[in-house]
Amino acid sequence: MAQVLLFTRTTDYRHASIAHAADVVGGLLRGDGHDVRHTEDPTAFRSDALASVALTVWLSTSGDVLDDEGRDALASWLADGGAWAGIHSATFSEPTWPEFERIAGAVFTDHPDVQTATVRVVDAGHPSTAHLPAAWRHTDEWYNFRSHPAADRTVLLTVDEADYDGGSMGEPHPIAWAGPYGRGRTWYTALGHEADAYDDPLLRAHLHGGLRSVLSPEEDA
């Protein structure tokens, strides 16, 4: 059993889906036998507190959610072998902390209205995508990012910009990726705006596989 810190603090836009999403994500982790602590307290990110944590999940966080001590603690803990998973607006967090872009892989800039579009699997061998069809019709809030993920990130999913209005990344438009941060592991998905999306078996399996991939990578090798 591992200790997981589920973090949903917001200081900017707050998604109405957070409560249901936290129940679903927490349930997936508890179903695997893990001890989940759900918090919005930034002081949970202290070196001594993180020492017993295996994974932190940033679920639809937004704005500046940590203080300087928490930022230093998170970066050190993750670089030393921790695990970070980000869901949806996690990339809309910590806009004044440059290092966070290296943790999350990219930074959110804007999005159009919720629309249905085609999601394409890029890496079918990853635990978060192995269950998905090659092309998947999904309704969500399609994020644009300041840049494409860094070269050390593996893009897992893209969305077809031709299918909806408001995409500005060009093709391919990444929406999920994974990669290292020092000796630590990261995974991010932009999916998960609407509360009812978390009732979709495909999205649940996508989330479950992503969480498992950073929490227990040896199980998914």
Each PLM stretch: what is its role?
Residues 4-7, 50-94, 183:
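Short alpha-beta junction capping motif
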Residues 11-12, 43, 62-65, 90-94, ...:
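Solvent-exposed loop/turn segments at secondary-structure junctions
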Residues 53-56, 101-105:
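Short, hinge-like loop/turn segments at secondary-structure boundaries
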Residues 1-53:
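Aromatic-Pro/Gly-enriched surface loop or interdomain linker
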Residues 92-103:
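Glycine-rich, charge-decorated loop segments at or immediately adjacent to ligand/cofactor-binding or catalytic sites
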Residues 3-4, 148-221:
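A glycine-centered loop/beta-turn motif at secondary-structure junctions
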Residues 30, 37, 106, 111-182:
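Catalytic beta-strand/loop cores that center a nucleophilic Ser/Cys/Thr
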